[in-house]
């Protein structure tokens, strides 16, 4: 996600009512390092969650495409870097549906990685923890969404193991 310039953010803030502006700033206070990216999400991308999810998925795909797979050490390091960025974007959204969608996509990309993650116990443990986290998050959703995401999780991940 490319952060907007300070001028663009300032221009967008002029159009917000004071109550909304105050809520944005209070939420911003929780994040110290990535304030600019969070404001970009809140002002420009929060209204269209689907396109936000797709842009984050494309960044995950780019990260996986650039992984150095010659050494499992570098592969593990790259995967952890991608995952930490993904967690940051999930935190910006704060929606469980977004979290489930992005983590399923990340796990799916881990499954299709070459060389396979089954060669590294550390990567398998990371994968298992992520799948467990997805399942736990699915349980927190509404019943309809819970069923839909459970079916999607089963079809996209369990078949590939």
What positions do the PLM features span?
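N-terminal interaction modules that seed assembly of large macromolecular complexes
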Residues: 2-67
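Residues that form generic nucleotide/phosphate-binding pockets
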Residues: 12, 42, 59, 63, ...
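Short, surface-exposed loop and linker segments with low hydrophobicity and enrichment for Pro/Ser/Thr
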Residues: 12-22, 88-105
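Charged, amphipathic alpha-helical oligomerization/scaffolding segments
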Residues: 27, 31, 55, 59, ...
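Amphipathic, non-membrane alpha-helical segments in soluble helical-bundle scaffolds
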Residues: 46, 50-53, 72-76, 93-101, ...
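Aromatic-anchored, charged helix-turn/loop surface patch used as a conserved interaction hotspot
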Residues: 50-90
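Glycine-rich, aromatic-bearing surface loops/beta-hairpins
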Residues: 101-161
């Amino acid at each position: 996600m490319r952060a907007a310039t300070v001028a663009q953010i300032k221009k967008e803030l002029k159009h917000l009512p004071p109550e909304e502006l105050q809520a944005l700033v209070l939420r911003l206070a929780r994040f110290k390092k990535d304030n600019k990216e969070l404001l970009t999400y809140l002002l420009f991308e929060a209204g269209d969650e689907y396109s936000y999810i797709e842009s984050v998925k494309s960044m995950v795909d780019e990260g996986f495409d650039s992984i150095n797979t010659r050494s499992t050490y570098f592969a593990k390091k790259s995967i952890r870097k991608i995952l930490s960025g993904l967690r940051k974007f999930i935190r910006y959204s704060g929606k469980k549906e977004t979290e489930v969608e992005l983590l399923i996509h990340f796990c799916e990309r881990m499954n299709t990685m070459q060389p396979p993650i089954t060669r590294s116990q550390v990567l398998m443990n990371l994968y298992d923890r992520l799948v467990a986290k997805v399942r736990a998050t699915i349980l927190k959703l509404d019943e309809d969404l819970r069923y839909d995401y459970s079916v999607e999780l089963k079809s996209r991940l369990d078949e590939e193991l």
